[in-house]
Protein backbone atom coordinates (compact mmCIF):
# COMPACT_ATOMS: atom_id res chain seq x y z
CA UNK A 1 0.00 0.00 0.00
CA UNK A 2 2.90 2.33 0.71
CA UNK A 3 4.05 2.03 -2.89
CA UNK A 4 0.58 3.07 -4.07
CA UNK A 5 0.90 6.28 -2.05
CA UNK A 6 4.29 7.05 -3.60
CA UNK A 7 2.96 6.41 -7.07
CA UNK A 8 -0.19 8.47 -6.44
CA UNK A 9 2.02 11.38 -5.44
CA UNK A 10 4.32 10.92 -8.44
CA UNK A 11 1.43 11.00 -10.92
CA UNK A 12 -0.56 13.73 -9.16
CA UNK A 13 -3.53 11.49 -8.42
CA UNK A 14 -6.52 13.44 -7.09
CA UNK A 15 -7.48 10.81 -4.51
CA UNK A 16 -6.54 7.28 -3.56
CA UNK A 17 -9.52 5.25 -2.33
CA UNK A 18 -8.63 2.01 -0.54
CA UNK A 19 -11.50 -0.45 -0.15
CA UNK A 20 -11.94 -3.34 2.23
CA UNK A 21 -12.46 -4.20 5.84
CA UNK A 22 -8.89 -5.02 6.80
CA UNK A 23 -6.76 -2.09 5.65
CA UNK A 24 -4.16 -0.93 8.13
CA UNK A 25 -1.72 1.88 7.51
CA UNK A 26 1.00 0.90 9.91
CA UNK A 27 4.75 1.37 10.21
CA UNK A 28 5.53 -0.79 7.18
CA UNK A 29 3.19 1.26 4.98
CA UNK A 30 4.65 4.52 6.28
CA UNK A 31 8.20 3.33 5.63
CA UNK A 32 7.40 2.30 2.05
CA UNK A 33 5.31 5.43 1.41
CA UNK A 34 8.19 7.69 2.50
CA UNK A 35 5.79 10.27 3.97
CA UNK A 36 3.55 10.47 0.87
CA UNK A 37 0.68 9.08 2.95
CA UNK A 38 0.73 12.47 4.68
CA UNK A 39 0.28 14.47 1.46
CA UNK A 40 -1.80 12.24 -0.82
CA UNK A 41 -5.54 12.68 -0.37
CA UNK A 42 -6.97 9.26 0.52
CA UNK A 43 -9.98 7.55 1.98
CA UNK A 44 -10.61 4.05 3.32
CA UNK A 45 -14.02 2.62 2.51
CA UNK A 46 -15.61 -0.73 3.27
CA UNK A 47 -17.47 -1.31 0.00
CA UNK A 48 -15.73 -1.00 -3.37
CA UNK A 49 -19.08 -1.49 -5.11
CA UNK A 50 -20.58 1.53 -3.34
CA UNK A 51 -17.52 3.63 -4.20
CA UNK A 52 -17.73 2.68 -7.88
CA UNK A 53 -21.45 3.46 -8.06
CA UNK A 54 -20.89 6.82 -6.36
CA UNK A 55 -18.08 7.73 -8.76
CA UNK A 56 -20.24 6.76 -11.74
CA UNK A 57 -23.00 9.08 -10.51
CA UNK A 58 -20.40 11.86 -10.25
CA UNK A 59 -19.52 11.39 -13.92
CA UNK A 60 -16.29 9.43 -13.66
CA UNK A 61 -15.25 6.94 -16.33
CA UNK A 62 -14.88 3.66 -14.48
CA UNK A 63 -11.91 1.87 -16.02
CA UNK A 64 -10.89 -1.46 -14.51
CA UNK A 65 -7.38 -2.84 -14.95
CA UNK A 66 -7.90 -6.59 -15.24
CA UNK A 67 -7.20 -9.33 -17.78
CA UNK A 68 -10.54 -10.74 -18.98
CA UNK A 69 -11.86 -12.30 -22.17
CA UNK A 70 -13.27 -8.90 -23.19
CA UNK A 71 -10.59 -6.52 -21.89
CA UNK A 72 -8.77 -4.28 -24.36
CA UNK A 73 -4.99 -3.78 -24.46
CA UNK A 74 -4.11 -0.53 -22.73
CA UNK A 75 -1.88 0.59 -25.62
CA UNK A 76 -4.92 0.49 -27.97
CA UNK A 77 -7.29 2.25 -25.56
CA UNK A 78 -8.02 5.96 -25.95
CA UNK A 79 -8.59 7.71 -22.63
CA UNK A 80 -11.04 10.61 -22.72
CA UNK A 81 -9.53 13.94 -21.70
CA UNK A 82 -12.83 15.65 -20.90
CA UNK A 83 -14.14 13.19 -18.29
CA UNK A 84 -12.54 12.28 -14.95
CA UNK A 85 -11.10 8.78 -14.68
CA UNK A 86 -11.43 6.32 -11.82
CA UNK A 87 -8.86 3.57 -12.37
CA UNK A 88 -9.95 0.44 -10.53
CA UNK A 89 -7.22 -1.95 -9.46
CA UNK A 90 -7.91 -5.25 -7.80
CA UNK A 91 -6.71 -7.18 -4.84
CA UNK A 92 -3.30 -8.81 -5.35
CA UNK A 93 -4.78 -12.29 -4.89
CA UNK A 94 -8.37 -12.02 -6.12
CA UNK A 95 -8.41 -9.24 -8.71
CA UNK A 96 -11.52 -7.15 -9.33
CA UNK A 97 -14.94 -8.58 -8.46
CA UNK A 98 -17.37 -9.55 -11.22
CA UNK A 99 -19.83 -6.96 -9.87
CA UNK A 100 -17.35 -4.14 -10.33
CA UNK A 101 -16.21 -5.42 -13.72
CA UNK A 102 -19.85 -5.40 -14.82
CA UNK A 103 -20.23 -1.81 -13.56
CA UNK A 104 -17.10 -0.65 -15.38
CA UNK A 105 -17.33 1.51 -18.47
CA UNK A 106 -14.19 -0.15 -19.81
CA UNK A 107 -11.88 -3.02 -18.88
CA UNK A 108 -8.26 -2.77 -19.97
CA UNK A 109 -5.20 -4.96 -19.56
CA UNK A 110 -1.46 -4.79 -20.06
CA UNK A 111 -0.18 -7.24 -22.66
CA UNK A 112 2.31 -9.70 -21.20
CA UNK A 113 4.81 -11.77 -23.16
CA UNK A 114 6.41 -14.02 -20.55
CA UNK A 115 5.30 -17.23 -18.88
CA UNK A 116 3.51 -15.64 -15.91
CA UNK A 117 -0.18 -14.79 -16.32
CA UNK A 118 -0.24 -11.68 -14.12
CA UNK A 119 1.97 -8.99 -12.66
CA UNK A 120 2.20 -7.24 -9.32
CA UNK A 121 -0.67 -4.79 -8.73
CA UNK A 122 1.60 -1.83 -8.00
CA UNK A 123 3.73 -2.38 -11.12
CA UNK A 124 0.60 -2.78 -13.28
CA UNK A 125 -0.84 0.40 -11.78
CA UNK A 126 2.38 2.28 -12.53
CA UNK A 127 2.22 1.21 -16.18
CA UNK A 128 -1.46 2.15 -16.44
CA UNK A 129 -0.97 5.57 -14.86
CA UNK A 130 1.97 6.26 -17.14
CA UNK A 131 -0.16 5.45 -20.21
CA UNK A 132 -3.10 7.53 -18.95
CA UNK A 133 -0.82 10.48 -18.15
CA UNK A 134 0.91 10.22 -21.53
CA UNK A 135 -2.44 10.39 -23.33
CA UNK A 136 -4.29 13.05 -21.37
CA UNK A 137 -1.54 15.58 -20.59
Give residue spans per PLM region.
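Post-transcriptional modification and biogenesis factors for structured RNAs
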Residues: 1-137
